[in-house]
């Protein structure tokens, strides 16, 4: 599976953007998001 770390190029401002594995945190421009809070599951590995 895809690692749930790093940056994603899409973020709706307040929605998860990392395949439900982690929540996203938008930057001030609202264009990118940072993946945070990885779950301890195989889906995030």
From Swiss-Prot:
Cell location: Secreted
UniProt keyword annotation of Signal present: no
UniProt KW keywords: Disulfide bond, Knottin, Neurotoxin, Secreted, Toxin
Matches recorded under InterPro entries: Agouti_dom_sf, Spidertoxin
Pfam families according to UniProt: Toxin_9
Predominant localisation class: secreted
GO CC term, one of those recorded: extracellular region
UniProt-recorded Gene Ontology molecular function terms: ion channel inhibitor activity; signaling receptor binding; toxin activity
Tissue: Expressed by the venom gland.
Disulfide bridge positions per record: 4-18, 11-24, 17-35, 21-44, 26-33
Keyword Transport: no
Similarity comment: Belongs to the neurotoxin 02 (plectoxin) family. 02 (plectoxin) subfamily.
Summary of the function given for this chain in its UniProt record: Potent toxin that may paralyze and/or kill insect pests such as H.virescens (lepidoptera), S.exigua (beet armyworm) and M.sexta (tobacco hornworm).
Domain notes: The presence of a 'disulfide through disulfide knot' structurally defines this protein as a knottin.
This protein's name: U1-plectoxin-Pt1d
Organism: Plectreurys tristis
